[in-house]
């Protein structure tokens, strides 16, 4: 690849996207170092693999590095970023540029979209692996079956998420480009929906003449750009107008099945062990990719049936005292609606308690109205203060303000809890046997579910009022 650059330093190495690239480079024999603000399961794993991981950001950490890779969360005044640039001869690049370099000698399957990227990437990866293509994979979440978010394969294909959040996905070279949906998101970078659509269109039109776009026809924002797509594309969805159609969708608990039709032919049945109509669409995207690559139908079926999910995507954390605890990464109104609909479909007889941690001030401000109307499938809602994710607070944009907006739109059992600790305290008093509790958000809200399970197990259950013994 780049033989002069043997020591690669990652600023923000603990991020899920950065860590996957770091793991691939370690497996390729490169010397990897990095820094992050705190020790996590991810940083411990990388350290065990041989990476030199530093806690905190200091200028001396970049000494000796041949190239420095920055997470999208790293600002210009970060001490390691500044030090590397002052050194002059050390390239300082963004994550997407390093990912693009890893893809340079591969055929790439890139999965883009506002929602569903991680699950769809995981499904495509699992199907390609089942089909014997042995892909190299970088996913934005830990695949349950593999225990990691990255895998170095020996095949000709690389499967990865294309993160649109800062526009750097335009640096990536797609051979096959999947777009799951386009939504109003990342308004700290994009001006408006038209800007987002235009950027996705540029991404799709980067496909070479021998490539293919795989586009979800259910999404209105994708439909509106189809006339301007210049490259070969196929569509998928529930509609009879889609090239790949999911028909006769059936759900049973956490399982879904459907029949695939394409261009007048019935291809067969697909079963997935991940609930939700949105995941039917995600799996259908994987079917379309696999058919483009001429994989056997049996391998497609087996690969999707074998797929057991991704951490933090409707992840069943456990059950204690007849209280079911689930965690999900959903932090956008569209994602929250889909997840809570799935929760209601899977557990119609349970009271549904949602613990939501808003993520980023800019997102909360831009989508306040949409957030106020996306929690109707919750019986009880706890909202914490906003998880900043390195952003500076915006006056008047708070978790309490969001709670007031949700209440004004008709939610009658809502509790504002300033911290995750206070959310746990309130939850302990509210929870009753038979409840389903789901934690939602891209920050550290998942801890509340784990703490709740530990308390329920240690206390031996809950009393009639819902209080722990």
Swiss-Prot record:
Q: Where in the cell is it found?
A: Cytoplasm
A Pfam cross-reference name: Mur_ligase
Protein name, entry field: UDP-N-acetylmuramate--L-alanine ligase
Entry keyword set: ATP-binding, Cell cycle, Cell division, Cell shape, Cell wall biogenesis/degradation, Cytoplasm, Ligase, Nucleotide-binding, Peptidoglycan synthesis
Question: Which gene does this sequence derive from?
Answer: murC
Q: What class of enzyme is it?
A: ligase
Any idea what job this protein has?
Cell wall formation.
Record's family?
Answer: Belongs to the MurCDEF family.
Pathways per UniProt: Cell wall biogenesis; peptidoglycan biosynthesis
Q: What is its EC number?
A: 6.3.2.8
Q: Which organism is it from?
A: Syntrophobacter fumaroxidans (strain DSM 10017 / MPOB)
Q: Which GO terms describe its molecular function?
A: ATP binding; UDP-N-acetylmuramate-L-alanine ligase activity
Which processes are annotated in GO (biological process)?
A: cell division; cell wall organization; peptidoglycan biosynthetic process; regulation of cell shape
Q: Which GO terms describe its cellular component?
A: cytoplasm
Q: Which reaction does it catalyse?
A: UDP-N-acetyl-alpha-D-muramate + L-alanine + ATP = UDP-N-acetyl-alpha-D-muramoyl-L-alanine + ADP + phosphate + H(+)
Instruction: Detail which positions bind ATP.
Output: 113-119
Please classify the protein's predominant subcellular localization into one broad category. cytoplasm
Quote the Gene3D superfamilies the UniProt record gives.
Answer: Mur ligase, C-terminal domain, Mur-like, catalytic domain, NAD(P)-binding Rossmann-like Domain
